[in-house]
C-alpha cells in the first residue's frame, strides 16, 4: 500500500513515517515502478512505534529494542523512571507505561490515541559526523556528534550485564562487552553512513590477556578486582610486595598489580603473550590488528608508569620479574591506529581525559569540576611540584592533566540533605 493509506490507518504523518524508515525502524519494499510499497507487517511495526512514542520512549531506545539489545521491560522501566523523576507516579503517562507491555502484546489498535511526532525529532545530522563510544563498568554508551555544528545528534546507553557470576574475582566477559559494543556501532553506522571518525574510551586500570593472534584469552579483570589485597604465602599482599621491592605504591585493581598477583599464583593464561585495556581490545577488534596500541592515559592507569618520560618503569618491572614484552606499545599522540568500514579509529584514551576533552571549549583556559559520589577537578598544566592529593595524568599530544580528587562530593550533599530533612527547622 502507498504512504497515504498508511497515514490514514496509523494516524502518523508522512514525515514521521519517513523518519522511522531513515532511522532503520522499518524496512520498506519497493513496487515495480520504484514507489514505496508498505506491507501489513510495516503497519504493525508503525503501530508499535506509535504506542512506544506515545509513552515518550525515545527513538534511540526503540531502535535498541527492535535490535534486541534492550528488552521491552528495559525500555519501559527506563521510561517509568524518567517520568517518575519528571512528574511523579500519578501522571497519565506513567499510567500509560504501566499498561504498555500488555497493549503491545494484545496488538492494540492505535488510531484512537492522539500522537504527533515532535518537529525537532524530525531533524538530525546530515553532515560529517564523529562517533564516541565509552565502555563503562555497567553500560556501553555512544554519542553521535555533528562536526560542523558541534551538536549532539544521538546518544545511546546499553547495559552490558557482563559480570562473570562463577568468578571469585571481579571479572567481566570480554565477548559480551565487545559483541554489544560492535552491535551498537553497527546500529549507528546503518543510520549514519557519513561517519568521519570513531573515538573510544572506557573504564580504566583493568586488563585483558591476549594470545599471539591478538585474541582475548581471559575475562576482563576490572578495576574493582581485589586480588592485589589478598594475603599470599608470605602473608604479604601483592600490592605490599610491589611497594617493598620497588618502593612504588600501587593500588589493587591496577593492571600491574593484577598481573603480578597472577604471575605469583600461576593464573596467567598459558597462551597469553600480553595484555591491554578493554577499550584497546575493542580498537584491535574493529581494526583487525594483532598487537595492542595503548595511549599514555591508559598505560598510566596500569601502574608503574613514568608520566614525565611517557613509558613504563622497566627497571621496576624487571625487579618484579615482569616480562616487558607483555606490556602494550605506548603512544602519547592521539594517532589513528586503523579503520572500520573505512572509518578512521583513533587510539583509545582514558575516561577522565575523554570527559575533560568533551566538556571544555578551550583546553588551556578551562577547568572541569565533576561531582559524583566524590568530587574531582581537572585542568591542563605543566609538570611541577604538587601537593598531596594532586596528581599529573597524561593528556593528549604530550600534555598533562592536573587532577585533584576528594571523597567529599555528592555524598556530602546527600548527608546534609538527610540531616535537614530529619529535623524540624522548617516546621517549627
Q: For the regions a protein language model found, what residue spans apply to each?
A:
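Carbohydrate-associated surface elements
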Residues: 225
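Acidic-glycine-rich active-site phosphate/pyrophosphate-binding loop
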Residues: 154-157, 230, 331-341, 380-391
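Gly-rich Lys/Arg/Thr-decorated short loops/hinges at beta-loop-alpha junctions or inter-strand turns
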Residues: 160-169, 241-242, 293-300
Amino acid at each position: 500500500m502507498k504512504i497515504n493509506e498508511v497515514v490514514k490507518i496509523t494516524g502518523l504523518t508522512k514525515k514521521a513515517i519517513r523518519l522511522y524508515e531513515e532511522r532503520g525502524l522499518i524496512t520498506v519494499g519497493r513496487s515495480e515502478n520504484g514507489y514505496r510499497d508498505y506491507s501489513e507487517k510495516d503497519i504493525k511495526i508503525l503501530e508499535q512505534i506509535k504506542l512506544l512514542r506515545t509513552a515518550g520512549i525515545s527513538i534511540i531506545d526503540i531502535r535498541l529494542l527492535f535490535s534486541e539489545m534492550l528488552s521491552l521491560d528495559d525500555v519501559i522501566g527506563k521510561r517509568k523512571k524518567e517520568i517518575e523523576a519528571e512528574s511523579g507516579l500519578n501522571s497519565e503517562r506513567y499510567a500509560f507505561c504501566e499498561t504498555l507491555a500488555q497493549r503491545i502484546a494484545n496488538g492494540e489498535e492505535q488510531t484512537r490515541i492522539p500522537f504527533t511526532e515532535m518537529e525537532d525529532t524530525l531533524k538530525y545530522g546530515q553532515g560529517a559526523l564523529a562517533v564516541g563510544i565509552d565502555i563503562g563498568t555497567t553500560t556501553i554508551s555512544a554519542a553521535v556528534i555533528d562536526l560542523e555544528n558541534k551538536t549532539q545528534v544521538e546518544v545511546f546507553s546499553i547495559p552490558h550485564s557482563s559480570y562473570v557470576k562463577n568468578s571469585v574475582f571481579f571479572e567481566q566477559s570480554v565477548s559480551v562487552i565487545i559483541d554489544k559494543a560492535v552491535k551498537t556501532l553497527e546500529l549507528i553506522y546503518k543510520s549514519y553512513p557519513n561517519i568521519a571518525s570513531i573515538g573510544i574510551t572506557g573504564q580504566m586500570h583493568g586488563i585483558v590477556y591476549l594470545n599471539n593472534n591478538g585474541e582475548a584469552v581471559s575475562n576482563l579483570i576490572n578495576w574493582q578486582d581485589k586480588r592485589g589485597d589478598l594475603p599470599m604465602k608470605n602473608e604479604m599482599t601483592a600490592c605490599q610486595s610491589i611497594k617493598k621491592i620497588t618502593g612504588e605504591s600501587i593500588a589493587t585493581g591496577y593492571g600491574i598489580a593484577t598481573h603480578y598477583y597472577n604471575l605469583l599464583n600461576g593464573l596467567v593464561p598459558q597462551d597469553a603473550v600480553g595484555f591491554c585495556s578493554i577499550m584497546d581490545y575493542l580498537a584491535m577488534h574493529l581494526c583487525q590488528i594483532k598487537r595492542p596500541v595503548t595511549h599514555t592515559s591508559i598505560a598510566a592507569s596500569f601502574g608503574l608508569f613514568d608520566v614525565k618520560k611517557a613509558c613504563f618503569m622497566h627497571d621496576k618491572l624487571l625487579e618484579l620479574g615482569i616480562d616487558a614484552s607483555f606490556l602494550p606499545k605506548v603512544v602519547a599522540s592521539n594517532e589513528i591506529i586503523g579503520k572500520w568500514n573505512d572509518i578512521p579509529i583513533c587510539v583509545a584514551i582514558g575516561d577522565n581525559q575523554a570527559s575533560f576533552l568533551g566538556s571544555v571549549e578551550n583546553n588551556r583556559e578551562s577547568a572541569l569540576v565533576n561531582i559524583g559520589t566524590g568530587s574531582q577537578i581537572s585542568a591542563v598544566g605543566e609538570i611541577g611540584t604538587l601537593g598531596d592529593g594532586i596528581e599529573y595524568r597524561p593528556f593528549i599530544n604530550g600534555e598533562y592533566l592536573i587532577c585533584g580528587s576528594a571523597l567529599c562530593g555528592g555524598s556530602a550533599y546527600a548527608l546534609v540533605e538527610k540531616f535537614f530533612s530529619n529535623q524540624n527547622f522548617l516546621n517549627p
